[in-house]
């Protein structure tokens, strides 16, 4: 199923996923496609931050759902 991931810059990324796929799997796909390291990605759906070990079905993410990605930036100290 196709879903959309919207970034803070307003860019929309499309990704193929399945209900049984984990959030960690999806983050890896985004990393491969966009070059954003997995550990910097935070995905939000319906106001909730998604946990890596949960699946799309756990969050009721269905085809053409839109997730939001914010980046977790590391401190420079």
Swiss-Prot record:
* Chain positions listed as propeptide in the UniProt record: 77
Which cysteines bridge via disulfide bonds? none
Q: Which InterPro entries match?
A: Ubiquitin-like_dom, Ubiquitin-like_domsf, Ubiquitin_CS, Ubiquitin_dom, Ubiquitin_ubiquitin-like
Gene Ontology terms describing biological process: symbiont-mediated perturbation of host ubiquitin-like protein modification
**Covalent cross-link Glycyl lysine isopeptide (Gly-Lys) (interchain with K-? in acceptor proteins) as placed by the record, residue numbers:** 76
Entry keyword set: Host cytoplasm, Host nucleus, Host-virus interaction, Isopeptide bond, Late protein, Modulation of host ubiquitin pathway by viral ubl, Modulation of host ubiquitin pathway by virus, Ubl conjugation, Ubl conjugation pathway
- Where is the protein found, in the record's own terms? Host nucleus; Host cytoplasm
Gene3D superfamilies xrefs: Phosphatidylinositol 3-kinase Catalytic Subunit, Chain A, domain 1 (3.10.20.90)
Asked whether the keyword Ubl conjugation is assigned, the reply is yes
Q: What is its main location?
A: host cell
SMART domains on file: UBQ
Question: A cellular component term (GO) from this record?
Answer: host cell cytoplasm
Q: Does the keyword Methyltransferase apply?
A: no
Give residues for the crosslink Glycyl lysine isopeptide (Lys-Gly) (interchain with G-Cter in ubiquitin). 48
Q: Extract the PANTHER family matched here.
A: UBIQUITIN
Q: Which family does it belong to?
A: Belongs to the ubiquitin family.
Q: What does this protein do?
A: Viral ubiquitin that may play a role in the viral ubiquitination of nucleocapsid proteins to direct the egress of the nucleocapsid out of the nucleus, therefore mediating the formation of budded virus (BV).
* UniProt protein name: viral Ubiquitin
The organism is Autographa californica nuclear polyhedrosis virus
Gene encoding this polypeptide?
Answer: vUbi
């Amino acid at each position: 199923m196709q879903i959309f991931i919207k970034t803070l810059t307003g860019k929309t990324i499309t990704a193929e996923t399945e209900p049984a796929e984990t959030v960690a799997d999806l983050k890896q796909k985004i990393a491969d496609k966009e070059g954003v390291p997995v550990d910097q990605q935070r995905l939000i759906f319906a106001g909730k931050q998604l946990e890596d070990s949960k699946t799309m079905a756990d969050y009721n993410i269905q085809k053409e759902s839109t997730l939001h990605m914010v980046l977790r930036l590391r401190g420079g100290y």
